[in-house]
Amino acid sequence: MWLGVVTLFPEMFRAVTDFGVTGRAVSKGLLELQTWNPRDFTHDKHKTVDDRPYGGGPGMLMMVQPLRDAIHAAKAAAGKEAKVIYLSPQGRKLTQQGVEELAKSSSLVLVCGRYEGVDERIIQTEVDEEWSIGDYVLSGGELPAMTLIDSVSRLVPGVLGKQASAEQDSFSDGLLDCPHYTRPESLDGLDVPAVLLSGNHEHIRRWRLQQSLGRTLLRRPELLENLALTGEQEKLLAEFVDSIKQDD
């Protein structure tokens, strides 16, 4: 997958290219990331990249000309098939379903805003989609862009050591993940559930599915409203609810 990022702070993306899962993906050639800094497209000695908004008010906007030229350069490098995404609080909220949609693209251009944002006409003429990582305010689009890159890259074939790791992640099937345990078997009086030590793969599968369903019910019940549960899932969830009532 090819990713282009338009940002005033390209150095921040070393966290993506040099570390962890995404860093390994870059070193293997599975992920390519390039950055374009609007400052490199300015025409004044001060490399000005902000401008005052019409109508007044606090704050500044990103200057149109350097930003637009940087986007054009990124699009030219990406090719005609690239989708241009602006990271914005007004955008569609990023979910695992959205991540899966974006992962089908061979190339993406991510535009990171700063200051109070960008000229609306840039969004209208240069941007294909707006995406948000949540209902809160950040200082710029770089962290949301890195979040999107990390989540999308996990679905690129070969990036994870085992594809099952991605398939078992929270939200991959619309549910929260089940609890996980490693050594030691007992920690401060808390023991690993016996079923995980049994070696019975079918029992372990059912336990994990039940825990995933139960955790979703307790922590994010709204997620279940949009799911069509199978007969097995309904039975396991009912058993989970009964066990809670008995504990009470």
UniProtKB/Swiss-Prot annotation:
Q: Which CDD domains match?
A: TrmD-like (cd18080)
Which SUPFAM superfamilies would you find in this protein's record?
Answer: alpha/beta knot
Q: What class of enzyme is it?
A: transferase
Q: What is its main location?
A: cytoplasm
Q: Which keywords fit this entry according to its UniProt record? A: Cytoplasm, Methyltransferase, S-adenosyl-L-methionine, Transferase, tRNA processing
Can you name a GO cellular component term? cytosol
Q: What are the binding positions for S-adenosyl-L-methionine in this chain?
A: 113, 133-138
Q: What is its EC number?
A: 2.1.1.228
Catalytic activity annotated for this protein? Answer: guanosine(37) in tRNA + S-adenosyl-L-methionine = N(1)-methylguanosine(37) in tRNA + S-adenosyl-L-homocysteine + H(+)
| Biological processes annotated in GO | tRNA N1-guanine methylation
State where the protein is found: Cytoplasm
Q: Which InterPro entries match?
A: Alpha/beta_knot_MTases, tRNA_m1G_MeTrfase_C_sf, tRNA_m1G_MeTrfase_TrmD, tRNA_m1G_MTases_N, tRNA_MeTrfase_TRMD/TRM10
| Pfam families assigned | tRNA_m1G_MT
- Which residues span the membrane? none
Q: What GO molecular function annotations does the UniProt record carry, in alphabetical order?
A: tRNA (guanine(37)-N1)-methyltransferase activity
What family does the Swiss-Prot or TrEMBL record give for this protein?
Answer: Belongs to the RNA methyltransferase TrmD family.
- Which function does this protein serve? Specifically methylates guanosine-37 in various tRNAs.
Alphabetized PANTHER family for the sequence: TRNA (GUANINE-N(1)-)-METHYLTRANSFERASE (PTHR46417:SF1)
* Subunit-level organization: Homodimer.
Q: What HAMAP family would the database entry show?
A: TrmD
* Protein name listed in UniProt: tRNA (guanine-N(1)-)-methyltransferase
Species this protein is from: Shewanella pealeana (strain ATCC 700345 / ANG-SQ1)
Q: Which gene encodes it?
A: trmD
